[in-house]
Amino acid sequence: MSRYTGPKWRISRRLGVSLSGTGKELSRRAYAPGDHGAGRRAKISEYGMQLREKQKLRFTYGLTERQFHALFNKAGKIRKGTHGTNFMILLEQRLDSLVYRLGFATTRQQARQLVNHGHIMVDGKRVDIPSYNVTPGQVVSVRDKSKNIVPIQAAVESVVARPQFVSFDAEKLEGSLVRLPEREELDADLNEALIVEYYNRLG
């Protein structure tokens, strides 16, 4: 299954989550496309809630269904912790997620493009694989030749705060994952247990 490239504002409204990270999609019309007001939304089944929660997380991180499901299965093999929490941690360990969290990009989509185009390094070596798994202690940086790129500079300057599980050096334009994130540091509006139920239901 290919990555969705259609109108993200429409998907944001349907799922009730801002995929751009700005919240603009929901500021004018918080109800789903096709509805004519917040009070008209139809009741949703248990399966529908599970599917919607899965789609919210998948679209937020911009993964294909195959990538998303593969990472979910990988999380299920981790013995310590819960399946859902481990899944969310693995999503945060993706290189494109760290690039976004460090503030090199204003959106995860932009972060993925920076990685794909070879602007990002891990421990001094260029890595152009967005799904690369970053482990605590590894240093993520911008290539010297890319440090003056306007979108990167603008993104770094716009950051108000970074999560506590990363460190950042503004002068060197580099940072690291100092530790794995705690569940409470991640999206509070998402119920990952519903995603576990969704895939368990499929068998």
Curated annotation (Swiss-Prot):
Gene3D superfamilies: Ribosomal Protein S4 Delta 41, Chain A, domain 1 (1.10.1050.10), RNA-binding S4 domain (3.10.290.10). Residues 93-153 form the S4 RNA-binding domain. One of its GO terms (cellular component) is small ribosomal subunit. One of its GO terms (molecular function) is rRNA binding. It holds the Pfam family Ribosomal_S4. Keywords: Ribonucleoprotein, Ribosomal protein, RNA-binding, rRNA-binding. The keyword Ribosomal protein applies. GO terms for biological process: ribosomal small subunit biogenesis; translation. PROSITE patterns: RIBOSOMAL_S4, S4. InterPro entries: Ribosomal_uS4, Ribosomal_uS4_bac-type, Ribosomal_uS4_CS, Ribosomal_uS4_N, S4_RNA-bd, S4_RNA-bd_sf. The keyword Translocase does not apply. NCBIfam families: PRK05327.1 (NF003717), rpsD_bact (TIGR01017). One of the primary rRNA binding proteins, it binds directly to 16S rRNA where it nucleates assembly of the body of the 30S subunit. Part of the 30S ribosomal subunit. Contacts protein S5. The interaction surface between S4 and S5 is involved in control of translational fidelity. Belongs to the universal ribosomal protein uS4 family. This is Small ribosomal subunit protein uS4.
